[in-house]
């Protein structure tokens, strides 16, 4: 379940491992940070986001480990970002991340893993 930790900030801790999914409200909607970590938890996170009633406008991966590159179709076809270095690694090692996810967790939409673009070099604008 998403827990509000500050105005416009919600956190959901994985039941499987100690990792957090974060939702931050911007002017236009939510930015999802590191959504995860298996198919069941991605569905639960999508349910939580639906209950908020705020559209997802972007995603962000904090680093290029497979469990931080996940996405779910229910979050929408929105831009997904990482730092330039993380986006480069994610794109170069996408097949490996998909294989690791398939070995480690179930129900993950493997085709959506690692589809991140580098943040704009000038720092903006980013949806949200």
Located regions from the model:
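Conserved beta-strand hairpin/beta-sheet module of binuclear metal-dependent hydrolase folds
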Residues: 2-47, 51
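Metallo-beta-lactamase
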Residues: 4, 88-128
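Short, well-ordered coil/turn elements that cap or connect secondary structure elements
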Residues: 6, 51, 75-77, 120, ...
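Surface-exposed, flexible loop/turn segments at secondary-structure boundaries
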Residues: 17, 67, 86-88
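Short loop segments at secondary-structure junctions
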Residues: 27-29, 78, 85
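Active-site metal-binding motif and surrounding structural segment of the metallo-beta-lactamase
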Residues: 40-82
């Amino acid at each position: 379940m998403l827990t509000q930790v500050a105005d416009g900030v919600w956190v959901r801790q994985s039941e499987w491992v100690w990792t957090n999914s974060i939702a931050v409200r911007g002017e236009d909607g939510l930015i999802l940070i590191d959504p995860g970590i298996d198919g069941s938890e991605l569905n639960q996170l999508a349910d939580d986001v639906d209950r908020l009633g705020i559209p997802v406008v972007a995603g962000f991966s904090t680093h290029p480990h497979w469990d931080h590159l996940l996405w779910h179709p229910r979050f929408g076809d929105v831009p997904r970002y990482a730092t330039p270095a993380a986006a480069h690694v994610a794109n170069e090692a996408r097949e490996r991340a998909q294989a690791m996810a398939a070995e480690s967790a179930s129900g993950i939409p493997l085709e959506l893993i690692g589809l991140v673009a580098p943040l704009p070099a000038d720092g903006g604008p980013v949806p949200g």
